[in-house]
Amino acid sequence: MEERPPENEGPQREPWDEWVVEVLKELKEEALKHFDPRLLTALGNHIYNRHGDTLEGAGELIRILQRALFIHFRSGCSHSRIGQPGGGNPLSTIPPSRSML
């Protein structure tokens, strides 16, 4: 008798869909802080025209946004410590307390 893997029956699991949507939402919010909204809209339209409203399209958009943000941060975004010499100190903007014990 030949062994075969179990058939993948039924629709894809819901939690995966929800996770993809949540990741995409978070990336979009971060991308809007760093890139022109018109550029992001054009990118979204391009992906939608190519893939429609599918998980495949969402995955491609996630990959592109992750790469764009990574490159943006590595080139020295002023909103990030990534790419700056020494990484910068995020606490340096907090003035020292005058009433130290």
UniProtKB/Swiss-Prot annotation:
GO terms under biological process: symbiont entry into host cell; viral penetration into host nucleus
Other notes: This is a macaque isolate.
Origin: domain of life: Viruses
Function: Stimulates gene expression driven by the HIV-2 LTR. Prevents infected cells from undergoing mitosis and proliferating, by inducing arrest or delay in the G2 phase of the cell cycle. Cell cycle arrest creates a favorable environment for maximizing viral expression and production.
Subunit-level organization: Interacts with human UNG.
UniProt cross-references to Pfam families, sorted A to Z: VPR (PF00522)
Keywords: Activator, AIDS, Cell cycle, Host nucleus, Host-virus interaction, Phosphoprotein, Transcription, Transcription regulation, Viral penetration into host nucleus, Virion, Virus entry into host cell
Database matches in InterPro entries: RetroV_VpR/X
UniProt subcellular location: Virion; Host nucleus
Species in which this protein is naturally found: Simian immunodeficiency virus (isolate Mm142-83)
Phosphoserine PTM sites in chain numbering: S80
Renumbered residue ranges of the record's region Disordered: 81-101
GO cellular component, one term: host cell nucleus
Main location: virion
Protein name according to UniProt: Protein Vpr
Compositionally biased tracts (Polar residues): 90-101
